[in-house]
């Protein structure tokens, strides 16, 4: 008889109930819990999965390149990026009648197509790609890279090529390699591409495989580099009237420090970007030589941590500092993953911010729907990564934390004074929540009674001060860069060459948008969401080992549900339920963030900033003038007269609501409910002649509480994302194309 799924757990494989299937799926990637798993085997399996992950990413990129080259309009778009709408791919749908075919035959295509809101056209154009042939070449290259990555993953699972546990635990060597080679070397390589290919293309000089060896990226060649006269590479930048992609007004500089934006493409200067990557690359290459490995020189991370102790003789014992942390982190994959996810989460949110405020891709600032989609996309990814960071922090405390090895160090002391941390986060959340909601509701009441002048409107003076210090003149605050005679301004004037930062911050760009009372309120609403999410995540991790109500929680494992007051209130210390609740709050918060970004920009793009400024100070303004007003076009995708090209978003909007609402059925429930439900369904099936023709291999049993809630959370999250994605894209593209 064939072995039952899952092969990695004999205990589960022999389970006679449907628990076998669901727990098998749930623990498929929890390698630590698999039968016969050793620490070395665990590291080897994870190492190989990295190559599989790279292969999937490569395949995805390859597919994008291939479909745009085959079914897109890249070459037509390149000829006129401001007026041609980029095509993502063709649509073939057997349900389409003539009306739908006509509605989706757009952007100069001869058959139904989807419009691209990914920014890929802008990216490829900026980095020097101009033809479909180049896209095909890129696609084939990425496909080969994916195949190579898959082979590498397979190879490192073979006995002769499996790295040892000592190799994985060599933190200094790994850090040097990641810093110098992966970050440093790749940044310098990217500078090379920008200087040798992208910048010449932006000046109308094609560089391809046929001529890249004999086209000098700079007229002076490598002479200035070897003589130390590097300033030559910054001389003669592109002029302010340069037409992007042509020699008209082009300069010869390759590494500049101009600041601001190219006036026509409204993106950062490519020569500034090249300079940035070169500097970053050099810093990382230096950083990659800092840690002691084979030659006995450089720092030992363990020594650095052991040396970081609080001063002796300080009033109150400050503990053992960072002693024991090196081994704790180096021996815990969950701790390392938590740190990596938190770092990546912050960086992803920063990418969302920078992609719109300081766009690096030519003409993307004028593709409003793409800007909205990319901002929203990156903020949603950021919250998922941040929640994951704390989830693995909780698992670390349950599976990997050793109280003896961390006695009285900073980690142990975090656990010891967790009540202070949690209660501080709690009062901050309560303060922000009551005061922000109080202001909004007060304003709602006075507006609804016809006295809008009685609103409490608070100017964000501290934020305006920061903007003024950075050079924004409109607030009339003579401080730092807003004051021509300040030390900051004088220092800026002494930097040689032309600089355009002040033009950018005071011009019609997205750098430091003007802010007022509406921004002040929504800023504090977002702060409430962030602090509440953090409270739930931090409490979930710090209470994962146990709390006052259940000090031995760690002995019950990780899959411990919040099960009401029956056992003395286990909701207090279920890391699972803390994670679920935090995801709801994170989605809530990212909703406010993206609503704010989108509405403010809709007002700017349509030339009607007064609408945001006047309506954003009370809740009904948000519901009526942002959500309701902007969903009307979307819902009209289908109407009595047929359908238009918003129909797909209208359908997705409705379907997203359905998925979202389904989630609540799984959330408002308990285990007895699921057992009754499943037994009722089984009873009905057993009395139906067709369903009874097949044997029941597994006895159906109820979902556990933790499982039922994750099903609810999955529906809530997916529905939430689908609904807002449809709303965002349809409401923006319906207005601006």
Swiss-Prot record:
Give me the residues that bind [4Fe-4S] cluster, please: 562, 571
MF GO annotations:
4 iron, 4 sulfur cluster binding; chlorophyll binding; electron transfer activity; magnesium ion binding; oxidoreductase activity
Bilayer disposition of the protein: Multi-pass membrane protein
EC code(s) of this entry: 1.97.1.12
Major site of localization recorded for this protein = membrane
Superkingdom in the source lineage:
Bacteria
- The residues that hold phylloquinone are 674
| Cofactor binding summary note | PSI electron transfer chain: 5 chlorophyll a, 1 chlorophyll a', 2 phylloquinones and 3 4Fe-4S clusters. PSI core antenna: 90 chlorophyll a, 22 carotenoids, 3 phospholipids and 1 galactolipid. P700 is a chlorophyll a/chlorophyll a' dimer, A0 is one or more chlorophyll a, A1 is one or both phylloquinones and FX is a shared 4Fe-4S iron-sulfur center.
* Keywords assigned by UniProt, alphabetized: 4Fe-4S, Chlorophyll, Chromophore, Electron transport, Iron, Iron-sulfur, Magnesium, Membrane, Metal-binding, Oxidoreductase, Photosynthesis, Photosystem I, Thylakoid, Transmembrane, Transmembrane helix, Transport
Where, by residue number, does chlorophyll a B3 bind?
665, 673
Any one GO CC term of the record: photosystem I
Binding sites annotated in the UniProt record for chlorophyll a B1: 657
Compartments, record wording: Cellular thylakoid membrane
Membrane spanning segments where?
46-69, 135-158, 175-199, 273-291, 333-356, 372-398, 420-442, 520-538, 578-599, 646-668, 710-730
Coiled-coil zones? none
Which InterPro entries does the entry link to?
Answer: PSI_PsaA/B, PSI_PsaA/B_CS, PSI_PsaA/B_sf, PSI_PsaB
Its UniProt entry gives the catalysed reaction(s) as: reduced [plastocyanin] + hnu + oxidized [2Fe-2S]-[ferredoxin] = oxidized [plastocyanin] + reduced [2Fe-2S]-[ferredoxin]
* One Pfam family from the record: PsaA_PsaB
Q: Name one GO biological process term.
A: photosynthesis
Q: What family, per the record? A: Belongs to the PsaA/PsaB family.
Q: Which PANTHER family match?
A: OUTER MEMBRANE PROTEIN, OMPA-RELATED (PTHR30128), PHOTOSYSTEM I P700 CHLOROPHYLL A APOPROTEIN A1-RELATED (PTHR30128:SF19)
Q: What does this protein do?
A: PsaA and PsaB bind P700, the primary electron donor of photosystem I (PSI), as well as the electron acceptors A0, A1 and FX. PSI is a plastocyanin/cytochrome c6-ferredoxin oxidoreductase, converting photonic excitation into a charge separation, which transfers an electron from the donor P700 chlorophyll pair to the spectroscopically characterized acceptors A0, A1, FX, FA and FB in turn. Oxidized P700 is reduced on the lumenal side of the thylakoid membrane by plastocyanin or cytochrome c6.
Describe, as the record does, how this protein assembles with itself and its partners. The PsaA/B heterodimer binds the P700 chlorophyll special pair and subsequent electron acceptors. PSI consists of a core antenna complex that captures photons, and an electron transfer chain that converts photonic excitation into a charge separation. The cyanobacterial PSI reaction center is composed of one copy each of PsaA,B,C,D,E,F,I,J,K,L,M and X, and forms trimeric complexes.
Query: Any idea what this protein is called?
Result: Photosystem I P700 chlorophyll a apoprotein A2
The source organism is: Parasynechococcus marenigrum (strain WH8102)
**Taxonomic classification:** Bacteria, Bacillati, Cyanobacteriota, Cyanophyceae, Synechococcales
Report which gene this protein is encoded by.
psaB
